[in-house]
């Protein structure tokens, strides 16, 4: 979503 995790 926000972080590329």
Curated annotation (Swiss-Prot):
Keyword terms: Hydrolase, Neuropeptide, Protease, Secreted, Serine protease
Function according to Swiss-Prot or TrEMBL: Stimulates cardiac output and hindgut motility, modulates visceral and skeletal muscle in many arthropods. Also inhibits activities of the human peptidase neprilysin (NEP/MME).
GO molecular function, one term: serine-type peptidase activity
A GO-annotated cellular component: extracellular region
Subcellular location: Secreted
Species of provenance: Carcinus maenas
Any single biological process term in GO: proteolysis
Tissue-by-tissue expression: Found in the crab pericardial organs.
Protein name: Proctolin
Top-level taxonomic group: Eukaryota
Main location: secreted
């Amino acid at each position: 979503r926000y972080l590329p995790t």
